[in-house]
C-alpha cells in the first residue's frame, strides 16, 4: 500500500488554507472535512512566496499550525514542496528563472509553469526549499507522502536551455559526425562543425506554427532533452527530500494523463508511486478516461496509482465547464478505483475566492456550509470508502491484451511533415482501446520496454518509430504463440526519425509478411471501403476506412480484406501472417468503429481472450484481483437503469455486503463491485 499508516483508499484533496486569513473558516473546514470523510489534505502546493519571502528567510509557522490542526482531527497530510510557481522577488532579482517561449519571447513574472528548468537559480532554490521542508517535517507523523512541485510541463528556449541542449547532445552522440548522421544534416545544408552552431528549435529556427518541424531529428531530441531536464528538476527535489525522509514515506508528483510534452514512462521510473490528475471535458468519451487510468497504471508495470486530483463537480479552464450530474462524481471515482487507483483526491477542498480558480469546483462551496448537493455526494463516497477499508488496496488488474503507447513515437509522428495533418496518434490508439472497452476486454497500456510474454494479444497502432531491438522482441513474441497487431504508418523510421530503407514497414516487414509500396492520404471526409473476403469470425461484409491508405503487397501474409474503391481497389487492406506459433495482423488504413469492434472480437476469440461480462451498451466493466479474490466493477454510464445478467454466477456485492445472482437492475450512474463467491 502507499503508506500503511492509512490502510484504506485515501479520500481528500488539495487544501489552500493560506488563502483565508480566518480561524473561523479554518475551524469550519476541519469540521466539514470530518463530516465528508476526508482523511488526507494536500498542503503547500503553491506557497513558495509565503514560505520564503526573501532570499534568506523561511517561514513555516503557518504550515506547522495547519498540519498539526488537521492531524489532531484525524486528517493526514500529502506535503507538497511549493515549487510549482517561483516567488516574484526571485524573478525580479534573478531573471534567468523566467522562460523564453516558443516564439522567442522572454516571459515576465506571472501565472505558473513559469520557471526555466535549466535556470541555475531555480534549480538551486527549489532544491534548497525541498531539503529545508524535509529536514523540518521528516519525523512528523501526519505526513504520509511528499508531493514534488505540481503538474510539470512547458518548454523553454532560452540561452541556458540552448547551452544545456548542446551539452546533452554531446553526451548522447559523443561526436558531431555521429550527430550529423543521426539528424541527416546533409539535407538543406545543415551540417554542424561546432557544437555552438546548434540552436534550440522553435519558431525562430526549425519549427512551424502547426507544430511540424523542418528537421524532425533536431526537434525530437529537443523534446527528449526538455523532458529529461524537467525530470532532473523533479529528481533534484526528490533526492533532497530522500536525504532526510525514510523510504517508507513515498515521493511523487502529479502527472496529467496523455499530456504530450513529457515521456511519462521515463518519469515513472523515478516516482515511488504514480499519481495523476483526471479532468475529462464535457465530450470526453468514458473509454478515453478509462484508457488514461490504464495508462497511468501501466507506467509502473501495473502497480496501483493515485488519483491525485479530480473536480468534485465542475472545472474552470475548459470552454464549457459543465456540472457533474448527480452520481457522476461517485461513478467516475469508482471507475478510477476499478482500474487501479488506491486514492480518491479532489481539487479543491474549499473553493478559492479570487483569481482564475474561483469557479473551479470544490467540496466546500462559496456558501460555506455542508448543505449542498456536491458536499453530500462527497460525504456519501467518503462513507463508502471507509466501509471498504483495505479490501481493494494493492489489488491488481490482470489483462491478457496490451496496447502499446510510446511518447517518443507520438512526438515523431506529430513533428513529421506529412503525410496528413489529420493523423492523431493518441486518437488512433484510443480507437483500438475503445473497441476493446465496448467488448468488455481488460487491457493494459504498456510502453515499448514492457515484457510481452505475459500477454496473448499485443496491439501497437501507428508504430511509426521502431526502436532498436523492438522488431526482434515482436518476432520472438509472435514465434512463441502471441498475436501481434499493428497498423498503417508503422515501421517507417528509427529512433532519430531516419527512414528504414528496404521498404515499409521496415524492420516489421518480416513478421508481418507484407510490403507497403505507397501511402495515400485523403481528406478525413473521403473514405474507402474494407471488403472482407468471405468471413472470419464475425468479420464480414463491408466497412469504411479513411485518413491514410497503405498500398500493400503480401509477402507470405494472407489478405483477409481488400480495398473497395479507387485505383487500388482489390489490394489488401487487412492481412494476417502466420509466424512461428503465432500470427501478426496488419490494418492498412484507419477503420470505422464498427469494423474495429468486429475485428477485435475476432482477434480475441482466436487468441482465447474472453470478455469480463456481457453487459448492455454504456455499461463499463473492469476487474481487480487480490489474494486470489476477483472484484468485478460494473459501472452504468447511462441515464437510465439497465439489467445486468450474471448468468448463474453467485457474487457478494461489496458495497452493500449482499449476496446477488441472476438478473440485477442497476440504476443510472450506478455502481456494482462484485466479489465472486
UniProtKB/Swiss-Prot annotation:
Possible reporter enzyme for halotolerant and halophilic organisms. May also be used in the food industry to digest plant polysaccharides in high-salt processes. No activity is lost during treatment with 20 or 100 mM EDTA in Z buffer for 3 hours at 0 degrees Celsius, nor is activity greatly stimulated by the addition of cations. Inhibited by 1 mM zinc and 1 mM copper, the levels of activity decrease to 10% of the untreated control. Nickel, cobalt and manganese at concentrations of 10 mM decrease enzyme activity to either 40% (for nickel and cobalt) or 60% (for manganese) of the activity in untreated controls. No change in enzyme activity in the presence of calcium and magnesium at concentrations up to 50 mM. The keyword Metal-binding applies. InterPro entries: Beta_galactosidase_C, Beta_galactosidase_Trimer, Class_I_gatase-like, Glyco_hydro_42, Glyco_hydro_42_N, Glyco_hydro_b, Glycoside_hydrolase_SF. The keyword Metal-binding applies. It comes from the Bacteria. One of its GO terms (molecular function) is metal ion binding. Substrate binds at residues 112, 150, 317, 357-360. Optimum pH is 6.5. One of its GO terms (biological process) is galactose metabolic process. Its EC number is 3.2.1.23. Hydrolyzes o-nitrophenyl-beta-D-galactopyranoside (ONPG), p-nitrophenyl-beta-D-galactopyranoside (PNPG), 5-bromo-4-chloro-3-indoyl-beta-D-galactosde (X-gal), o-nitrophenyl-beta-D-fucopyranoside (ONPF) and p-nitrophenyl-beta-D-fucopyranoside (PNPF) with greatest activity towards ONPG and PNPG and low levels of activity with ONPF and PNPF. Detectable, but very low levels of activity towards p-nitrophenyl-beta-lactose (PNPL), p-nitrophenyl-beta-cellobiose (PNPC), p-nitrophenyl-alpha-galactopyranoside (PNP-alpha-G), and p-nitrophenyl-beta-xylopyranoside (PNPX). Dimer. This is Beta-galactosidase BgaA. It comes from Planococcus sp. (strain 'SOS Orange').
Amino acid at each position: 500500500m502507499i503508506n500503511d499508516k492509512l490502510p484504506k483508499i485515501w479520500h481528500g484533496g488539495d487544501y489552500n488554507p493560506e488563502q483565508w486569513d480566518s480561524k473561523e473558516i479554518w475551524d469550519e473546514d476541519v469540521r466539514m472535512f470530518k463530516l465528508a470523510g476526508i482523511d488526507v489534505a494536500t498542503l503547500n502546493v503553491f506557497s513558495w512566496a509565503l514560505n520564503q519571502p526573501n532570499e534568506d528567510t523561511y517561514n513555516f509557522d503557518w504550515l506547522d499550525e495547519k498540519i498539526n490542526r488537521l492531524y489532531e482531527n484525524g486528517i493526514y497530510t500529502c506535503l507538497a514542496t511549493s515549487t510549482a510557481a517561483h516567488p516574484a522577488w526571485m524573478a525580479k532579482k534573478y531573471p534567468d528563472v523566467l522562460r523564453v517561449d516558443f516564439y522567442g519571447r522572454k516571459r515576465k513574472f506571472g501565472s505558473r509553469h513559469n520557471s526555466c528548468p535549466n535556470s541555475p537559480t531555480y534549480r538551486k532554490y527549489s532544491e534548497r526549499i525541498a531539503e529545508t521542508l524535509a529536514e523540518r517535517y521528516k519525523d512528523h507523523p501526519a505526513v504520509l507522502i511528499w508531493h514534488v512541485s505540481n503538474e510539470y510541463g512547458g518548454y523553454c528556449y532560452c540561452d541556458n536551455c540552448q547551452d544545456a541542449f548542446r551539452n546533452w547532445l554531446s553526451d548522447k552522440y559523443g561526436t558531431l559526425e555521429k550527430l550529423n548522421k543521426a539528424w541527416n544534416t546533409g539535407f538543406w545544408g545543415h551540417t554542424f562543425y561546432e557544437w555552438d552552431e546548434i540552436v534550440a528549435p522553435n519558431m525562430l529556427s526549425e519549427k512551424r506554427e502547426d507544430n511540424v518541424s523542418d528537421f524532425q531529428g533536431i526537434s525530437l531530441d529537443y523534446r527528449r532533452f526538455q523532458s529529461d531536464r524537467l525530470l532532473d528538476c523533479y529528481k533534484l527535489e526528490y533526492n533532497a527530500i530522500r536525504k532526510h525522509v525514510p523510504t517508507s514515506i513515498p515521493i511523487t508528483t502529479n502527472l496529467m494523463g496523455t499530456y504530450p510534452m513529457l515521456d511519462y514512462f521515463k518519469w515513472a521510473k523515478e516516482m515511488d508511486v504514480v499519481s495523476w490528475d483526471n479532468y475529462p471535458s464535457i465530450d470526453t468519451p468514458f473509454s478515453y478516461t478509462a484508457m488514461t487510468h490504464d495508462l497511468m497504471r501501466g507506467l509502473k508495470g501495473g502497480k496501483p496509482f493515485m488519483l491525485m486530483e479530480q473536480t468534485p463537480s465542475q472545472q474552470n479552464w475548459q470552454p464549457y465547464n459543465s456540472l457533474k450530474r448527480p452520481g457522476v462524481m461517485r461513478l467516475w471515482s469508482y471507475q478510477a478505483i476499478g482500474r487501479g487507483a488506491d486514492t480518491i483526491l479532489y481539487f479543491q477542498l474549499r473553493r478559492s475566492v479570487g483569481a482564475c480558480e474561483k469557479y473551479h469546483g470544490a467540496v466546500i462551496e462559496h456558501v460555506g456550509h455542508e448543505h449542498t448537493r456536491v458536499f453530500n455526494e462527497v460525504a456519501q463516497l467518503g462513507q463508502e470508502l471507509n466501509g471498504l477499508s483495505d479490501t481493494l488496496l494493492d489489488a491488481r488488474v490482470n489483462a491478457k491484451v496490451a496496447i502499446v503507447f510510446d511518447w517518443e513515437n507520438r512526438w515523431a509522428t506529430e513533428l513529421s511533415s506529412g503525410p496528413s495533418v489529420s493523423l492523431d496518434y493518441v486518437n488512433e490508439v484510443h480507437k483500438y482501446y475503445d473497441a476493446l472497452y465496448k467488448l468488455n476486454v481488460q487491457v493494459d497500456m504498456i510502453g515499448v520496454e514492457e515484457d510481452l510474454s505475459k500477454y496473448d494479444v499485443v496491439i501497437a497502432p501507428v508504430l511509426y518509430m521502431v526502436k532498436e531491438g523492438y522488431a526482434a522482441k515482436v518476432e520472438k513474441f509472435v514465434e512463441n504463440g502471441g498475436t501481434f497487431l499493428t497498423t498503417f504508418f508503422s515501421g517507417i523510421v528509427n529512433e532519430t526519425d531516419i527512414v528504414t530503407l528496404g521498404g515499409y514497414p521496415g524492420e516489421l516487414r518480416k513478421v508481418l509478411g507484407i510490403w507497403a509500396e505507397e501511402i495515400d492520404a485523403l481528406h478525413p471526409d473521403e473514405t474507402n471501403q474494407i471488403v472482407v473476403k468471405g468471413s472470419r469470425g464475425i468479420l464480414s461484409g463491408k466497412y469504411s476506412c479513411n485518413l491514410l491508405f497503405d498500398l500493400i503487397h503480401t509477402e507470405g501474409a494472407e489478405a483477409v480484406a481488400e480495398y473497395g474503391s479507387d485505383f487500388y481497389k482489390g489490394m489488401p487492406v487487412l492481412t494476417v501472417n502466420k509466424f512461428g506459433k503465432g500470427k501478426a495482423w496488419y490494418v492498412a488504413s484507419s477503420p470505422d468503429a464498427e469494423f474495429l469492434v468486429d475485428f477485435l472480437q475476432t482477434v480475441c476469440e482466436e487468441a482465447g481472450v474472453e470478455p469480463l461480462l456481457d453487459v448492455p451498451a454504456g455499461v463499463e466493466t473492469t476487474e481487480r484481483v487480490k489474494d486470489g479474490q476477483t472484484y468485478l466493477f460494473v459501472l452504468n454510464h447511462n441515464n437510465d437503469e439497465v439489467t445486468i445478467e450474471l448468468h448463474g454466477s453467485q457474487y457478494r456485492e461489496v458495497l452493500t455486503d449482499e449476496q446477488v445472482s441472476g438478473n440485477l437492475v442497476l440504476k443510472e450512474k450506478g455502481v456494482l463491485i462484485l466479489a465472486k463467491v
